[in-house]
UniProtKB/Swiss-Prot annotation:
Gene coding for it: hslU
Protein name: ATP-dependent protease ATPase subunit HslU
Residues annotated for ATP binding in this entry: 18, 60-65, 258, 323, 395
PANTHER family linked to this entry: ATP-DEPENDENT CLP PROTEASE ATP-BINDING SUBUNIT CLPX-LIKE, MITOCHONDRIAL-RELATED, ATP-DEPENDENT PROTEASE ATPASE SUBUNIT HSLU
Species this protein is from: Thioalkalivibrio sulfidiphilus (strain HL-EbGR7)
Domain of life the protein comes from: Bacteria
One GO location term (cellular component): HslUV protease complex
Keyword line: ATP-binding, Chaperone, Cytoplasm, Nucleotide-binding, Stress response
Length: 444
């Protein structure tokens, strides 16, 4: 669990996301409250439930990006799902309980990587010994009277090979090693609601013939990686890991529910809205707190934090069923992006768009320099196209940048030297498309 303060979390999010202070503060406080709850006495800790968040804002303003960055900062089981993927129980599609099963899988993967990292050094030493055993097999004795090889000589030779192995001199040499056989994956089609049975059957088929080994011929570089992973997995207690992962999900799990507005009832329409409302009703017990059966045991969802987000173009937050609204008490509104925000998006974040394109073309010897007036012109054009057609927020910048640099990207292998992207260059490449509204609808 991350112990970063709210201020540190916001500063970290500022490196990648422009603006949206309210949303950043809300998720930072929610994440810090997870840590605060862990410091409480056990009796009081059980009573403190997370305050779930609903983020409201147009598309392309940073809702999903906040979730992606939060996943890296949280150091806790985290999963991002689209509400549109799920259907009411009885309809064809995934049921909402699979969210918790996927969250447990994510927790086990996270914990396994952490535990394998702790034993990595010992695993590398064990893998090194196995490679040396293949390179220097123990000599066979021909008969009862034959003299065994001198131990000091053997040890000295082994140390020489160990030194060469660590220096990378043997990396390209091929050897044959015995490794655990990879279980064959079996795809099982099951009716809706039977995903858990399919998962158990897959585990059963994979365990058939478990413990078998196979001989593989690999370069020492690749063999070392494979053997290190195998030795590390052997050193980790899998049963304890599963118990800890389930406990981690129950206490620290975070679920990001994207596109929640797509399952809201739109006005007085009927038909497919029945299923939409059904998804909301199925989400209620998860958000409120219930017990979900997974292949690793029962998981209680009382203390899992849910962050929902949606654009709410065609519906309003009040179109969600009242019970679900009550379970998302913290509302955060994200503002639409302006031309000034676009300028900052193009230049300020770590690995900004201009930096990415410059680095890509630098690989071919083309040095692209974005002038300040050129960046501002790109931002103005993106804003104008958003206003005249559909407003897709910062995603419009990707479209504009691709169109702007299309010719340079195509001619890059034959063109060496600097290229300056200023306002005149941007106008030359894009102005005609922007002026022609019909054309800009299709191309930009």
């Amino acid at each position: 669990m991350s112990d970063m303060t709210p201020r540190e979390i916001v500063q970290e999010l500022d490196k990648h996301i422009v603006g949206q202070k309210d949303a950043k503060r809300a998720v930072a406080i929610a994440l810090r409250n997870r840590w605060r709850r862990q410091q409480l006495p056990e009796a009081l800790r059980q009573e403190v439930t997370p305050k779930n968040i609903l983020m409201i804002g147009p598309t392309g303003v940073g809702k999903t990006e906040i979730a992606r960055r939060l996943a890296r900062l949280a150091n806790a089981p985290f999963i991002k799902v689209e509400a549109t993927k799920f259907t009411e129980v009885g309809y064809v599609g995934r049921d909402v309980e699979s969210i918790i099963r996927d969250l447990v899988d994510a927790a086990i993967k996270l914990l396994r990587e952490q535990e394998m990292g702790k034993v990595r050094f010992r695993a590398e030493e064990a893998a090194e010994e196995r490679v040396l055993d293949v390179l220097l097999p123990a000599p066979r004795q021909a008969g009862f009277m034959s003299e065994p090889a001198s131990a000091p000589e053997q040890s000295e030779t082994r140390q020489k090979f160990r030194k060469r192995l660590r220096e990378g001199q043997l990396d390209d040499k091929e050897i044959e090693i015995q490794v655990s056989a990879t279980p064959v994956g079996v795809e099982i089609m099951t009716p809706p609601g039977m995903e858990e049975m399919a998962s158990q059957l897959q585990s059963l088929f994979q365990n058939i013939g478990g413990g078998r080994s196979q001989t593989r011929k690999l370069k020492i570089r690749d063999a070392m990686k494979l053997l290190t992973d195998e030795e590390a997995a052997r050193m980790v207690n899998q049963d304890e890991l599963k118990l800890r992962a389930v406990a981690n999900v129950e206490q620290n799990g975070i679920v990001f529910l994207d596109e929640i507005d797509k399952v809201a009832k739109r006005g007085e329409y009927g038909g497919a809205d029945v299923s939409r409302e059904g998804v909301q009703r199925d989400l209620l017990p998860l958000v409120e707190g219930c017990t979900v059966n997974t292949k690793f045991g029962m998981v209680r969802t009382d203390h899992i934090l849910f962050i929902a987000s949606g654009a709410f173009h065609l519906s309003k937050p009040s179109d969600l069923i009242p019970e679900l609204q009550g379970r998302l008490p913290i509302r955060v509104e994200l503002s639409a992006l302006t031309a000034e925000d676009f300028v900052r998006i193009l230049t300020e974040p770590d690995a900004s768009l201009t930096e990415q394109y410059s680095a890509l073309l630098q690989t071919e010897g083309v040095e692209v320099n974005f002038a300040e007036d050129g960046v501002r012109r790109i931002a103005e054009i993106a804003t104008r196209v958003n206003e005249r057609t559909e407003n897709i927020g910062a995603r419009r910048l990707h479209t504009v940048m691709e169109r702007l640099l299309e010719q340079i990207s195509f001619e890059a292998p034959d063109h060496q030297g600097p290229v300056s992207i200023d306002a005149a260059y941007v106008d030359e490449r894009l102005e005609e498309l922007v002026q022609d509204e019909d054309l800009s609808r299709y191309i930009l």
